[in-house]
A protein has these predicted regions:
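Conserved G/P- and acidic residue-centered "switch" motifs that form tight phosphate/ATP-binding loops
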Residues: 109
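N-terminal beta1-alpha1 cap of cysteine-dependent amidohydrolase-like domains
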Residues: 1-106, 116-117, 124, 128-167, ...
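Hydrophobic, aromatic-enriched interface-forming segments
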Residues: 112-114
Length: 248
């Protein structure tokens, strides 16, 4: 049975945006042998939890919203987009379950920001940089990312371009600032120092988040490898739990 990956609907207020972006995430996990499970934003917490409990891992996708700055005790920047409280609530349920049950987590773009705030981190609400971090879908390569050599991400990506450097797309205007509990910075944009990836510090819990959109470039091995790492972590967790059950 393939691992089931919980993916929340990206945005509660824009069905067209959600239906345009969500299939890319679903296809990305299907390509590496997993089953995507859509998590609705308009159901009761009890209904959502029943779906979440059936899943083996979590993928937090991007969104056109911004995390409510009140969640990290900040005043709203004039360029901060409206929040999506329904998405925030579902993300919190997903992350609470993932941390309680040690389920693997992958955050992408908004998903990185949501994860960091959940772990009591803060965000840069609007990046002031000459680098075009908000390049969007029409720009396949926006800038490069330098990955820490000793990180899990470096071992996952194994970049052929040059050691621990990859070229990425980019569709964000916010970034992690103060890093949340149990997370560490593992990649930055070398041109301006903007944080581009985080991962968990616990060796027995797979947590990875990237600021770019690997689901848009799954024909490239570094992008596909990111999703493969999530699925492999989900399989490893399942095998470990099965072994513990059999030994009882």
């Amino acid at each position: 049975m393939p691992p089931r990956i919980a993916i929340p609907i990206p945005h509660s207020g824009d069905p067209e945006y959600a239906e345009r972006s969500l299939p890319q995430y679903e296809r990305a996990v299907e390509l590496v042998g997993a089953e995507p499970v859509r998590i609705p934003l308009d159901k009761s917490p009890a209904t959502v939890m029943k779906l979440i409990e059936r899943c083996d891992a979590v993928l937090l996708p991007g969104s056109k919203a911004d995390v409510d700055p009140a969640k990290y005790d900040a005043e709203r920047h004039p360029k901060t987009a409206p929040a999506d409280p329904k998405r925030d609530t579902v993300d919190e349920l997903l992350l609470q379950d993932a941390y309680n049950m040690r389920k693997p987590v992958l955050g992408i773009c908004y998903g990185l920001q949501s994860l960091n705030v959940y772990r009591k981190g803060t965000l840069v609400q609007h990046i002031g940089s000459a680098v075009n971090h908000a390049a969007g879908r029409k720009v396949p390569i926006a800038h490069s990312v330098q990955i820490d050599a000793g990180s899990k991400l470096a071992s996952v990506v194994n970049s052929p371009q040059s050691p621990f450097v990859i070229s990425v797309n980019s569709s964000h205007h916010q970034a992690a600032e103060v890093i949340g509990d149990g997370l560490r910075v593992v990649a930055k944009c070398p041109e301006d120092g903007v944080i581009e990836a985080l991962e968990g510090t616990s060796p027995d819990h797979f947590v990875l988040a990237v600021q770019w959109h690997p689901e848009r470039s799954t024909e490239d091995e570094p992008s596909r490898a990111i999703f493969r790492s999530l699925v492999e972590a989900a399989r490893a967790r399942h095998e470990k739990l099965s072994g513990e059950f059999e030994s009882v």
